[in-house]
């Protein structure tokens, strides 16, 4: 794709006003762009950093057209929007990301089928439409396996681990509600991710390989650079993916590494990703900077420089009291509080980035500091 460069003062429309939209807006504004955001939550984080706010549901056609008419380019911060609605908008307005990636990736089945056709390394899977299909999954995959809903899952929602026959009932109940995909369970050594930006004329910029740890299915911390020898292999897998799926802007591919050190593609997020937040302080360009450069038609940096090894930690609602007590003593903690109105114990409320000469020591220090968040 080739498209015109936006000039200073042009307007970027963002569908979605969560923390990703907020950080996109902040990158856009420092480059001289104006921002309009559309979100159904009148207190969304992005509202208070945007030049204009449209309070509307994501399926409100009139509001989406208002956003498009008042924007020089439109982007989105998450994938759970209607691909049909997005397809209509791409015919009327400038949306470099397009609708194809959303159409493929918001459905776990089409995502896996596309990855399989692209010859990437993925775990064996079975389409689940009926309870009978679950029995076929047992035959093909064996125990244990994971049942995931085809649509709408994030942060571990819509997933069930089935270890034996006695745990099938919960899976049956899930399948009765909606179609699913069953995946073979992997004995995981490590989870990693690779954040990538594709720009005008297929320029491609890679961020360093990121090592991730989840707790209760929510990203807990990210260490960069990843303590793994799989970066080149991960890049090769991403190259296969980008030949199969149209991308413009920043996206992230998540991988599993098993105990035999084999790399598997897990899933793709077609927008900036939680594991890339460290890049705001730790890199010469953040994942949001490169996203804005891409969708506005600007040239991307040839390479991303990691300024220092880094540990990034998500901050949940239950972490904020401790953080408020400790923050003033630690000027080296780069704190981002997203501005969500309702504080819940397991809700992502912000993140914290620490640049360090010793990630292992820093990692252990933070685990001790955040009581109850260690393994």
Swiss-Prot record:
Keywords: ATP-binding, Ligase, Nucleotide-binding, Purine biosynthesis. One of its GO terms (cellular component) is cytosol. Its EC number is 6.3.4.18. GO terms for molecular function: 5-(carboxyamino)imidazole ribonucleotide synthase activity; ATP binding; metal ion binding; phosphoribosylaminoimidazole carboxylase activity. One of its GO terms (biological process) is 'de novo' IMP biosynthetic process. Pfam families: ATP-grasp, PurK_C, RS_preATP-grasp-like. The keyword Transmembrane does not apply. InterPro entries: ATP-grasp, ATP-grasp_carboxylate-amine, ATP_grasp_subdomain_1, PreATP-grasp_dom_sf, PurK, PurK_C, PurT/PurK_preATP-grasp, Rudment_hybrid_motif. It comes from the Bacteria. It is an enzyme of class 6 (ligase). It catalyses: 5-amino-1-(5-phospho-beta-D-ribosyl)imidazole + hydrogencarbonate + ATP = 5-carboxyamino-1-(5-phospho-D-ribosyl)imidazole + ADP + phosphate + 2 H(+). PROSITE patterns: ATP_GRASP. Residues 112-296 form the ATP-grasp domain. Pathway: Purine metabolism; IMP biosynthesis via de novo pathway; 5-amino-1-(5-phospho-D-ribosyl)imidazole-4-carboxylate from 5-amino-1-(5-phospho-D-ribosyl)imidazole (N5-CAIR route): step 1/2. ATP binds at residues 108, 148, 153-159, 183-186, 191, 214, 266-267. Catalyzes the ATP-dependent conversion of 5-aminoimidazole ribonucleotide (AIR) and HCO(3)(-) to N5-carboxyaminoimidazole ribonucleotide (N5-CAIR). Homodimer. NCBIfam families: PRK06019.1-1 (NF004675), PRK06019.1-5 (NF004679), purK (TIGR01161). Belongs to the PurK/PurT family. This is N5-carboxyaminoimidazole ribonucleotide synthase. It comes from Staphylococcus epidermidis (strain ATCC 35984 / DSM 28319 / BCRC 17069 / CCUG 31568 / BM 3577 / RP62A).
């Amino acid at each position: 794709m080739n498209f015109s460069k936006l000039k200073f003062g042009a307007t970027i429309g963002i569908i979605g006003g969560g923390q990703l939209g907020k950080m996109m807006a902040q990158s856009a504004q420092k480059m001289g762009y104006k921002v309009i955001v559309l979100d159904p939550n009148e207190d969304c984080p992005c509202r208070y950093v945007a030049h204009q706010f449209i309070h509307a549901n994501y399926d409100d056609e009139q509001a989406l057209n208002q956003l498009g008419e008042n924007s020089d380019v439109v982007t989105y911060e998450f994938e759970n929007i209607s691909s049909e609605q997005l397809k209509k908008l791409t015919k009327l307005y400038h949306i470099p990301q397009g609708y194809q990636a959303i159409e493929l990736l918001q459905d776990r089945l089409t995502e896996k089928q596309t990855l399989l056709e692209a010859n990437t390394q993925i775990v064996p899977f079975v389409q689940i439409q009926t309870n009978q299909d679950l029995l076929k999954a047992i035959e093909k995959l064996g125990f244990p396996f994971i049942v995931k809903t085809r649509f709408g899952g994030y942060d571990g929602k819509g997933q069930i681990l089935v270890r034996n026959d006695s745990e099938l009932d919960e899976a049956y109940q899930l399948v009765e509600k909606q179609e699913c995909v069953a995946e073979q369970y992997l004995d995981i050594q490590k989870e990693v991710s690779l954040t990538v930006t594709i720009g005008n004329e297929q320029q491609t910029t890679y961020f360093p390989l990121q090592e991730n740890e989840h707790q209760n299915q929510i990203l807990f911390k990210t260490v960069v650079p990843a303590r793994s020898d799989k970066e080149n292999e991960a890049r090769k897998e991403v190259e296969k993916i980008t030949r199969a799926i149209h991308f413009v802007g920043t996206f992230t591919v998540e991988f599993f590494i098993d105990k035999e050190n084999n790399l598997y593609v897990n899933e793709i997020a077609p927008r900036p990703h939680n594991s890339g937040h460290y890049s705001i302080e730790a890199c010469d360009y953040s994942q949001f900077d490169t996203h804005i450069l891409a969708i506005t038609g600007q040239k991307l940096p040839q390479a991303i420089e990691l300024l220092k090894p880094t540990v990034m930690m998500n901050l949940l609602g239950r972490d904020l009291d401790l953080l408020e007590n400790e923050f003033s003593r630690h000027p080296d903690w780069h704190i981002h509080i997203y501005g969500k109105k309702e504080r819940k114990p397991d809700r992502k409320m912000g993140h914290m980035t620490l640049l360090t000469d010793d990630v292992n020591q820093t990692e252990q220090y933070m685990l001790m500091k955040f009581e109850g968040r260690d393994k």
